[in-house]
Amino acid sequence: MVGSESVYCGEQGRGGGDNVEAFRFPPGDAPLAACDCSRRVFCAGMLTGTLASAMSLGGCAARRNEAESSAVPAKQTSKRSSATKATAAPKSSWIAAIQQDIEALVESYGDSVSVYAVALDPQTFASFDGEVAVAPDARHAAASIIKLPILACALETVTAGELSLDEQITVTQQDIVGGSGNIQSRGAGVSYSIDELLHAMIAQSDNVAANLVIGRLGMDTVNETCAALGLTQTVLARLMMDTEAQAQGRENYTSARDAAAVLQRLAAGTIATPELCERARGYLLAQEDARGIVEGVPGGVLVAHKTGSLANAQHDAAIVYAERPYVLAILTQDLEREQALALERDISFAINARAHS
């Protein structure tokens, strides 16, 4: 049975009930304008070339710090070992130089934290010459980070001509679930385009939108995309808010490396057509949750990211358009929410300081 509005199990972020606001979709092709993003100001004049193009879609939604609540998911994780800390990537780049700093930040948390960061080429946004990795392949309950591979699958399906962003899907009463997002407040009988659903799934972490997209693509198709992309620790095993599936032990999983891999491909524009990747980056730039990684980045630096939370998990994965751009994914479990968010902020700050040095 899929959970109802009265059971808020969090699949990240924004809840129903009193927290539901008027549902809206910023137009995907709206021109960039200066806007206040909860203590961070992004202005069109600050960007040129690729970054300006990346901001041209999806807009910049007002970011809010909001309380979240959730129910307990199943837990499954890999133990950290010295082998997971070491990587085969060259250790000569600016980002690899802070491996020890990040290890020191997370040392006291044992197996509760996974971090993966990779430098990007400032021109092509392809992965560059170094990484930071602390238990990057440990498997975590994915929460709403699972929406990244769902997005990737949708983009690939559109590229293949098997799906249109303009295709309409009508919400039925059976589709209404609680947790994150505002579509639930509009009720059944309302139709949305695939483009609108993808935007809501990422920017607002909307669970109804995610389930509708999964239903259109097929769960097996999403998992096939994960396999094709080399996401070895990622699996989609249930719909959002499906408490019955959780009780039966079915859970969605991912790793820090897998989450970063999807974002790196989106940054480089290689997961689908460049135009579709640009639109997807617009969804990520419109993310409404401004905690975690965003708090460790100074104003004026663009962050395209996706967060995820459950009762015992707090995750964030981002493309950070710093002077030296990079992708950063931080997955935590069994920490108090504020403790996890503070750690995400501190890791983000440490890496971003090097990105501008």
Show where each model-derived region lies.
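Mid-domain, small-residue-enriched loop/turn segments at the edges of structured enzyme/sensor domains
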Residues: 112, 211-263, 267-268
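Active-site SXXK
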Residues: 139-169, 328
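Short, glycine/proline-biased beta-turn/loop segments that scaffold the active-site neighborhood
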Residues: 160-186
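Short, Gly/Ser/Thr-enriched beta-strand-loop segments that form substrate-interacting elements
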Residues: 291-344, 352
